[in-house]
Design a protein with these regions (language model features):
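Non-cytosolic membrane-interface motifs at loop->transmembrane helix junctions
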Residues: 30-41, 94-97
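A hydrophobic membrane-anchoring alpha-helix module
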Residues: 115-164
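Iron-sulfur (Fe-S) cluster-binding segments and ferredoxin-like electron-carrier domains
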Residues: 37-52, 102-104
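Membrane-interface loop-to-helix entry segments
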Residues: 35-45, 110, 129-143
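Membrane-embedded alpha-helical transmembrane segments of multi-pass integral membrane proteins
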Residues: 13, 17-20, 46-49, 71-81, ...
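Interfacial segments of alpha-helical transmembrane regions
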Residues: 2-12, 52, 56-76, 146
Length: 164
């Protein structure tokens, strides 16, 4: 049942995921870090791919499902990295901390600090029952990766023999 309606389910999962992130940012003022922003990219690519799949008939859809698979791998890379950074296991990218230039005065230093709004990647800004958003995203992308692989294999993995 899940695999039969996979395209619609994937669209709903992706739409909820990206909508949740945007609502958290713009309505609840939970500013994303650099890794959070990179974890949104797969959902945008998945949604665009699904629009092509839904709209264009006689399209080689396997290419788009493979693109979705690559998007899931990309997202898993960044979400696993983010979970590692949050748990102080891995080091975050340089954009996740404030880089200040040498200043000649305290007022210049203060101006630099106040002009930069940098959200640290190692701080959990939101969690659900103790599970960070990056961890939830890892699980969602893992489900997408596994179910999309099953869908690809069932629909495109083996040649179906026709009765002659």
């Amino acid at each position: 049942m899940i695999i039969r309606n996979w395209t619609l389910l994937l669209f709903i999962i992706s739409l909820i995921s990206i909508s949740s992130a945007l609502i958290a940012e713009y309505f609840f003022n939970l500013q994303p870090c650099e890794l959070c922003l990179k974890q949104r990219h797969p959902y945008y690519l998945i949604l665009v791919s699904l629009v092509f799949i839904f709209i264009i008939k006689n399209l080689n859809k396997v290419v788009f499902y493979l693109l979705i698979q690559l998007a899931a791998v990309y997202g898993l890379f960044y979400s696993i990295w983010h979970v590692g950074v949050e748990n102080k296991i891995l080091k975050g990218p340089s954009g996740c901390s404030v880089m200040l230039k040498n200043s000649e005065s305290a007022s210049d230093l203060k101006a630099q600090i106040l002009s930069k709004q940098v959200i640290s990647c190692d701080e959990v800004i939101w969690s659900f029952f103790g599970i960070s958003a990056a961890s939830i995203n890892t699980l969602v992308l893992l489900v997408i990766f596994i179910l999309n692989a099953i869908y690809l294999f069932k629909n495109y993995g083996t040649k179906k023999e026709k009765n002659v």
